[in-house]
Amino acid sequence: MSSQGFMSKIALPYAEALVESASSASALDQINQDLSLISEILNQSQELKTFFYNPLITTEIKKNVVSSLFTNQVHSLVIRFLLVLIDRRRIALLDVIISKYLELVYQLQSTVIAEVLTPVLLTDVQQSALINKIKDMTNSKTVKLVITIKPMLIAGFIIKIGSKTIDTSLYGRLKHISAYLNAVS
């Protein structure tokens, strides 16, 4: 089993518990925003990430930092959840837990996450059209686009929804032609 699969197995019960707690408190949207904020902060601050993941730093110090950083910034449920993760020495799995949490919430809300790779930024009209097309394809209520700019695609785009990939990029077409020509010769 890969380490990512192992971490996902450990993270899933925590994510499920958080979804249940957030749902009971009627705070799913607020918790989503708060976890996105925390994830963004951790991605921007390597020092903070290293601090939380360091097993040599005591749980008390980590708890104090969480309290000072996030009190009055995020929902109290999120703070309590972070403190539980620190107590159980699972704070190093926070990224995976947040990812699993969002997956579960999006499933609950019939939301599909579509990763879109494009060479240029899509306009609002293009994004709306893409969202509508993905809604039709997946029969979902809502679609969340995660757009990444990849200039090497030249033109077109790549859409990843779960394990499915739709590649309409010029780069993908050229790669396909190259593979065909290499196979023929």
UniProtKB/Swiss-Prot annotation:
Topology in membrane: Peripheral membrane protein
Main location: plastid
Any single GO CC term annotated in Swiss-Prot or TrEMBL for this entry: proton-transporting ATP synthase complex
Presence of the UniProt keyword Transport in the record: yes
Keyword tags: ATP synthesis, CF(1), Chloroplast, Hydrogen ion transport, Ion transport, Membrane, Plastid, Thylakoid, Transport
Pfam families: OSCP (PF00213)
Molecular-function annotations in GO: proton-transporting ATP synthase activity, rotational mechanism
InterPro entries cross-referenced by the UniProt entry: ATP_synth_OSCP/delta_N_sf, ATPase_OSCP/d_CS, ATPase_OSCP/dsu
Listed HAMAP family: ATP_synth_delta_bact (MF_01416)
NCBIfam families: ATP_synt_delta (TIGR01145)
Described purpose of this protein according to its UniProt entry: F(1)F(0) ATP synthase produces ATP from ADP in the presence of a proton or sodium gradient. F-type ATPases consist of two structural domains, F(1) containing the extramembraneous catalytic core and F(0) containing the membrane proton channel, linked together by a central stalk and a peripheral stalk. During catalysis, ATP synthesis in the catalytic domain of F(1) is coupled via a rotary mechanism of the central stalk subunits to proton translocation. This protein is part of the stalk that links CF(0) to CF(1). It either transmits conformational changes from CF(0) to CF(1) or is implicated in proton conduction.
Subunit structure: F-type ATPases have 2 components, F(1) - the catalytic core - and F(0) - the membrane proton channel. F(1) has five subunits: alpha(3), beta(3), gamma(1), delta(1), epsilon(1). CF(0) has four main subunits: a(1), b(1), b'(1) and c(10-14). The alpha and beta chains form an alternating ring which encloses part of the gamma chain. F(1) is attached to F(0) by a central stalk formed by the gamma and epsilon chains, while a peripheral stalk is formed by the delta, b and b' chains.
Record-linked PANTHER family: ATP SYNTHASE DELTA CHAIN
Protein name per Swiss-Prot or TrEMBL: ATP synthase subunit delta, chloroplastic
Lineage, opening ranks: Eukaryota, Rhodophyta, Florideophyceae, Rhodymeniophycidae, Gracilariales
